[in-house]
Every structure is written in C-alpha cells, then in structure tokens.
C-alpha cells in the first residue's frame, strides 16, 4: 500500500505549467489553423472554405476583446448577458478559434513530458509504430493463439465535468481550467449532454479528442495497475502520459475496495498470456484463461467505471466471446482466428502414417455491407450497392472528376490491402468506377455506354492503384512463388489515420 501511495504522490516540482498567457499569442492560432487545414483534408474534398473563417484580422480582434474583458472577468462569467459583448458577437467562430488554440496550448506540457521521458529511457522514436496497420501484425502473432476475447465498449462520461476533473491532475493552471469550464458550460448545455455534446465535439474536434484521450489514459492507467499487480503504473509505450498528480486522493474509495481483494482476488487474475488492444472507444482483452477469469475481469471493469469515473455500466458493454467462432470488428476489418487443417504423411521403414495438424490462422476481411453503407451515405451508390452519379461534382472538369474518384479508390485499396479476400474490395472498385462513368455521362448529357464508346475504355485507367504498380516492380509475376507473395496480405506502415469511408463506427 505504501508503494502504491508513493507512486501516486508524484513530484509536484515539475508540474508548474502556466498556460493561460499563451491564449493571447497570435502564433498559437496560426499553429492551430495550420493543423486544422492538414487534419480536415478529407478524401472527399468537400470541406472547402475552412480557410475563409480564419484571418489575422479576426485573431487580432479576438485577442483585443479578450484583453478588454479579462479584467472584469466577463470571459469567465456569463451572469450579465447584456454587457458581455464578447459572447454576443461571432459567438460560434470565436469559440471555435479559442478552443482550437486552447487545444494546442494544453498539449504543450504533455509533449514536453513525453520527450523527456523518451530521452531518459533511451527510447528511439519509431514513426512506423504510429501506423494503424502496425496493430495487425501484432494481432496475427499474438491473439490468434488465444482462446477467449473480451470486447469492451468504454463508456463515455455523461457529464463533461468528469473530463475537466481528469485534466486537473495534469495541468495545475487554474485559469486555463476555468477557461475550459467556460466553454463547456457556454457551448454545451449541461442538461442535454447527448445532443449538445455531439454538436460541441463536431465544432471543436481537436479539443474534444484531447479531453477524451486524457479520459482514456486515466482509465487505462488503472487497468495496467490491475494487470501487473504492482504499484508501478508506468508503461513503456505511453511514457509519462500515465503519470498523474492527484490520483491517490481521487480513487481513495476504489483503492480501499481493491486493497481488500488484492491478496485473494487478484491472484485469480494473474495471467501472463494476456494482451490488450484499444482503438477509439473500443478495447479488446485476449487471454488463454478460463471463462471464470474473464468474468472476474468484467467484474473489475464494472467496479472501476462506477467507483472512479461515476459511470453506470450498461448491459452489453462487455462481451465475452471465443475467438475461434467470433469476428472482431476493428479498424474497418473483420478479424478472426480460424483453424487451418493440414495433413502430413510420414513414413518409417515399411510403415506409413498420417498426422492431422491444425494451425490457427489469422484472417482479415473487408466488411462489404458497412462499406457500401458508407458509399451510399457519400452518394456514390444506393443502399443496395447500385452505382449512381455524384451530382455535386458535375460542375468540375473531367480531369478533376476522374482524379477525385481515382484518389478515393486508391486510398481504399491502400487501406484495405491487408484483406485476406479481395472480392469485397473489387466490388467497391467496381462501384466507384461505374459511379465515375455515370457522373461524367451526366455532365455531358449522355449515356454511360455511349460516353465510354466515344472516349474509350482507357479513360478510367486512374483507378489502377499505386500498390499494384509497386508490386509489379518488386514482385515479378513470372514465377509461382511470386504469385503467392502477391496474393498475401500487405500491411503499410505509413497510414496514420483511418480512411473516411472505412470508418463505420
């Protein structure tokens, strides 16, 4: 218990971060603006006009009003709505600008902590580990040999004040936290968290993602403590992001509950063959243990949510499944581990015998129904998968239309290159090709057949993916061995964000 408390009571001398003055610096908004341009470039290219909302004049006007009203504390109080001109003029635009600037500022101490932690531990930064595809080789090597999998939908805080309380353990600048509460109170109605919170998160994505990730980090740090049965909560992969200041005081009740059960119950949770994976709000816990062990983990997760995060666990949040007859819906793939039987014939002197051997094989396929639903939502086809024309693109030139369709097709092919079965991917390519042809035919007021006959079938050569061209150079198609390599799954280490159409969650 003393070791546990010693870790939780971290050194406070390194936690003096005064971030509030940075909110008045122009370069902060310029950095947030550049980040927003890079992050909001969708493959559908339908978010033009983002740059028109931000200008140096608007930033200067915003900072002037913040200086003007900060002495009267009107930026932190909304009691007198008649005098608070800051809130009344350009309310949504100013809130979005300040929230994005605040998100850049509050990430500074975390970046400094992470860099210092990596330097002290001698860890070399590997950009390949940032790739989304890097998780699948791990699943193929580890989880395919396991028996049970625990699928967990991490509950989201009903009240956004829980997110502020979590951030309070990391940032000791009271003014910055008051500013954050001001935004959450003014632009999110506390009485209707679902509707207002959704609107707030869409307008202020970077700040919302930061708050949610800090919430997940708090949740996972306690889970690591239970997993390792130790007071040492630090993780090599997460670095100092798992360190907090006021952790012990907040979970005093939770500690009392767990300490009483450590000597008996946690012994039942000891399982060296256990792996944990998380993406977005879903986590997976795989084990070679028994169903009783998985039920014990379910019990501890429910108590963790209720005692520490004040969240009531809803039915169906945690599901226990056997891996060999269940598929994991993760990162736009349906992943499963199936037995691949093989027969080996052996001969010893005059006696021959057959050995039946079954090997677990990790299988990944593209879920065709959700992907068609995403295409239908983007107006490339109907709900049945029949291609339709993209009417909003008919004003573009022919080369721009082909370039946009080709870019979407290449991105999907690049992201789903790890699929074990290519039929679903070929169907998606067919839908996009025919949708492109229908769009061009609609623009020229012609039929698809007449349009392709007039211009030739080579018009849609843009749809040949870059991966195929690379494979032609690296894997010659002459030998049968190279053909087997060509059909294998390929995981790329340069994918740092999930494809717009592949994100069905």
Curated annotation (Swiss-Prot):
Which key words are in the record?
Answer: Chloroplast, mRNA processing, Plastid, RNA-binding, tRNA processing
Name its cellular compartments.
Plastid, Chloroplast
Q: Which cysteines are joined by disulfide bonds?
A: none
**Domain of life according to the entry:** Eukaryota
Q: Which InterPro entries does the entry link to?
A: Domain_X, Maturase_MatK, Maturase_MatK_N
Indicate yes or no for the key word Ligase.
no
Protein name in the entry: Maturase K
- Organism annotation: Hedera helix (English ivy)
Taxonomic lineage of the native organism? Eukaryota, Viridiplantae, Streptophyta, Embryophyta, Tracheophyta
């Amino acid at each position: 218990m003393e070791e546990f408390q010693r870790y939780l009571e971290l050194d406070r001398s390194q936690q003096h971060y005064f971030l509030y003055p940075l909110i008045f610096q122009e370069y902060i908004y310029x950095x947030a603006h550049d980040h927003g341009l890079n992050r909001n470039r969708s493959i559908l290219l339908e978010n033009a006009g983002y740059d028109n909302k931000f200008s140096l004049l608007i930033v200067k006007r915003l900072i002037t009003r913040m200086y003007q009203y900060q002495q009267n504390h009107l930026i932190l109080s909304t009691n007198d709505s008649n005098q608070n001109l800051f809130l009344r003029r350009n309310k949504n635009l100013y809130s979005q600008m300040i929230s994005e600037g605040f998100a850049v500022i509050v990430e500074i101490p975390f970046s400094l902590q992470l860099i210092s932690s990596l330097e002290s531990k001698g860890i070399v930064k590997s950009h390949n580990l940032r790739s989304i595809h890097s998780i699948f080789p791990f699943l193929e090597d580890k989880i395919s040999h396991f028996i049970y999998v625990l699928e967990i939908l991490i509950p989201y805080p009903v009240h956004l004040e829980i997110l502020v309380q979590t951030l309070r353990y990391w940032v000791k600048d009271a003014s910055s936290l008051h500013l954050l509460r001001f935004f959450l109170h003014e632009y999110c109605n506390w009485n209707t968290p679902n509707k207002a919170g959704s609107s707030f998160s869409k307008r202020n994505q970077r700040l919302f993602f930061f708050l949610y990730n800090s919430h997940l980090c708090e949740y996972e740090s306690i889970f690591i403590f239970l997993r390792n049965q130790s007071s040492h909560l630090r993780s090599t992969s997460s670095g100092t992001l798992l360190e907090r200041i006021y952790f012990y005081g907040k979970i005093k009740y939770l500690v009392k509950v767990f300490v009483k059960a450590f000597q008996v119950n946690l012994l039942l949770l000891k399982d060296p063959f256990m792996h944990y994976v998380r993406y977005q709000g879903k986590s997976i816990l795989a084990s070679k243990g028994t169903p009783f062990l998985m039920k014990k983990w379910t019990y501890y997760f429910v108590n963790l949510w209720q005692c520490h995060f004040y969240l009531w666990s809803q039915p169906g949040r945690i599901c226990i499944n056997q891996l060999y007859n269940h598929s994991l819906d993760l990162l736009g793939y349906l992943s499963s581990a199936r037995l691949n039987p093989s027969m080996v014939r052996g001969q010893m002197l005059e006696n021959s015998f057959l050995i039946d051997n079954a090997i677990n094989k990790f299988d990944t396929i593209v879920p065709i129904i959700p992907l068609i639903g995403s295409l239908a939502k983007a107006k490339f086809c109907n709900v049945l998968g029949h291609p339709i024309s993209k009417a909003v693109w008919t004003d573009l030139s022919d080369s721009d239309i082909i370039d946009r369709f080709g870019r979407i097709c290449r991105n999907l092919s690049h992201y789903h290159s790890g699929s074990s079965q290519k039929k679903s991917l070929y169907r998606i390519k067919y839908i996009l090709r025919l949708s492109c042809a229908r769009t061009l035919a609609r623009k020229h007021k012609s039929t698809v057949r007449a349009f392709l006959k007039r211009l030739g079938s080579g018009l849609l050569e843009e749809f040949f993916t870059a991966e195929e061209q690379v494979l032609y150079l690296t894997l010659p198609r002459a030998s049968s061995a190279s053909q087997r390599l060509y059909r294998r799954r390929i995981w790329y280490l340069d994918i740092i964000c999930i494809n717009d159409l592949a994100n069905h969650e």
